[in-house]
Swiss-Prot record:
<comment type="pathway">
    <text>Carbohydrate degradation; glycolysis; D-glyceraldehyde 3-phosphate and glycerone phosphate from D-glucose: step 4/4.</text>
</comment>
<dbReference type="InterPro" id="IPR000741">
    <property type="entry name" value="FBA_I"/>
</dbReference>
<dbReference type="Pfam" id="PF00274">
    <property type="entry name" value="Glycolytic"/>
</dbReference>
<feature type="active site" description="Proton acceptor">
    <location>
        <position position="175"/>
    </location>
</feature>
<protein>
    <recommendedName>
        <fullName>Fructose-bisphosphate aldolase class 1</fullName>
        <ecNumber>4.1.2.13</ecNumber>
    </recommendedName>
</protein>
<dbReference type="GO" id="GO:0004332">
    <property type="term" value="F:fructose-bisphosphate aldolase activity"/>
</dbReference>
<dbReference type="InterPro" id="IPR023014">
    <property type="entry name" value="FBA_I_Gram+-type"/>
</dbReference>
<dbReference type="InterPro" id="IPR013785">
    <property type="entry name" value="Aldolase_TIM"/>
</dbReference>
<keyword id="KW-0704">Schiff base</keyword>
<dbReference type="GO" id="GO:0006096">
    <property type="term" value="P:glycolytic process"/>
</dbReference>
<feature type="active site" description="Schiff-base intermediate with dihydroxyacetone-P">
    <location>
        <position position="212"/>
    </location>
</feature>
<keyword id="KW-0324">Glycolysis</keyword>
<comment type="similarity">
    <text>Belongs to the class I fructose-bisphosphate aldolase family.</text>
</comment>
<keyword id="KW-0456">Lyase</keyword>
């Protein structure tokens, strides 16, 4: 583990850029960027277009390590190059800590939650992540209803996989998303917090994790988790809120920082000039940084 990167993730001012839309969500991400499905004829062309978009983001002067602590990549992005370097090396040289999305998507809903599908090639994927100088990983589950058994299952699965990731020298981001439209969202979050605390308390002192959570209904609910000795940082997802709304809610949570995907890229378009693109990205970065650092 890179100690300098760990220090930056633990104490740095800023947020994490989530650039990890995978195969399933790529056509949608490209469409929002202004690239329609008739502009590519196969998966390779599609992934090249999305890599071009991400390259444009990470090489922009607005993608500044003074504001952006880390970036989460999709497996395809990790294996491609930016300006002649593997993406993670390009980011690290720029001062941005690279993470890799490792999950294979969500299973069918059961007990009000969606567990992660089995990650069958996890070991070899983590070995490749180490070769590519990745610092940490991210994996997402989804909680839709107040169901204690379901929430428990989500957290247990996350910690089980997290321990395999830690054993390979990487820092896992555990992401049990709570659907922002869930009927009992505030109650779900209390149960989730208790389960996460149990999982954290069962870790050895040297087993470090990060958490990526939905912004809680009750401000500062996750403060105790953020201060847990095994937690490097707690980050939040935008979860379907607009950037403005997500930023507003984030400002009410003292120890949390953003890890936004859609809310970061929502104003970026393929047809923008360099100046327009850099300004749109810069405005987004500025506002998300502000919500992550300057609290109410």
């Amino acid at each position: 583990m890179n100690k300098e990167q760990l220090e930056k993730m633990k104490n740095g001012k800023g947020f994490i850029a989530a650039l990890d839309q995978s195969g399933g969500s790529t056509p949608k991400a490209l469409k929002e960027y202004g690239v329609n499905e008739d502009q590519y004829s196969n998966e390779d062309e599609m992934f090249q277009l999305v890599h071009d978009m991400r390259t444009r983001v990470v090489t922009s002067p607005s993608f500044s390590p003074d504001k952006i602590l880390g970036a989460i990549l999709f497996e395809q992005t990790m294996d491609r190059e930016v300006e002649g370097k593997y993406t993670a090396d390009y980011l690290a040289d720029k001062g941005v800590v690279p993470f890799l999305k490792v999950d294979k998507g969500l299973a069918e809903e059961q007990n009000g939650v969606q567990l992660m599908k089995p990650i069958d090639n996890l070991d070899s994927l983590l070995d490749r992540a180490n070769e590519r100088h990745i610092f940490g990983t991210k994996m997402r589950s989804n909680i839709l209803e107040l169901n204690e058994q379901g929430i428990k299952d989500v957290v247990e699965q996350q910690f089980e996989v997290a321990k395999q990731i830690i054993a390979k020298g990487l820092v896992p981001i555990i992401e049990p998303e709570v659907n922002i439209n869930a009927k009992d969202k505030a109650e779900i979050e209390k149960v989730l917090k208790a389960e996460l605390k149990k999982g954290l308390d069962n870790l050895n002192a040297d087993q470090l994790v990060m958490l990526k959570l939905t912004i809680p209904t009750e401000p500062n609910l996750y403060k105790e988790l953020a201060e847990h000795p095994n937690v490097v940082r707690v980050v939040v997802l935008s979860g379907g809120y607009s950037r403005e709304k997500a930023n507003e809610l984030l400002k009410d949570n003292a120890e949390l920082i953003a890890s936004f995907s859609r809310a970061l890229a929502s104003d970026l378009r393929a047809g923008q000039s360099k100046e327009e693109f850099d300004k749109a990205l810069g405005d987004a970065v500025e506002s998300i940084y502000d919500a992550s650092v300057n609290k109410n």
